[in-house]
Amino acid sequence: MSEKVNKTSLIHDAAFRKTLKDPAAARDFLEQVLTPYQKSRCNLDTIELEPTTFVAESLRQSACDVLLSMKTNDGKDGYIYTLIEHQSSPDKFIPLRMMRYILAVMEQHIEEHKCAPVVIPVLFYHGAKRPYPYPMNWVDCLDDPAYGREIYGEQKPFSLVDVSTLTDDEIEHYHRMAALMFTMKSGTSGDVIELIGKSITLTDKYGSSVHQNIVLTYL
């Protein structure tokens, strides 16, 4: 990875993390990402950003991992795990890497609490290659997916948020995340003055000066 690309990735990572540190912004994100059933099981009033220092360094070199925890509505612990990917050439094995993350989260929780939580994986993607070109079902990563399904059954694909496929109206539904997502979608192809104006409009409507500063730093 070139020094320029690595520096850009660090800026992206920091902007995404700083925004999701705000529980209200994290809630806006999850309100759009989770299915109605998942939302019915999650207590979104208990969202917390968790450390991910237990995740192996080899898994963290090319991705920014964000782990959000919350209680379920029946009082049990649960996790939402979001992975933000910055590679210009998407990796078709990302679902397998996310499986490793899921197991790492479970193992850490088992060590501390002697029980295994449900982990909901989400890939947030805004890479240069658009739209995201690969399946999100980890079984499709295998050399023989059909045989894999015979062994492992039909697995549900992981959730994907690809900003390049979202309309501006759809992005606005993410409220406090909208300004950052709009900027990520536009990338370097948009007019900077227009991007700044749109970002300010969105943060004035949904966010705060903190969110605005994050987006302006990103630009």
Regions found by a protein language model. Name each.
Residues 1-219:
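Elongated, amphipathic alpha-helical interaction scaffolds
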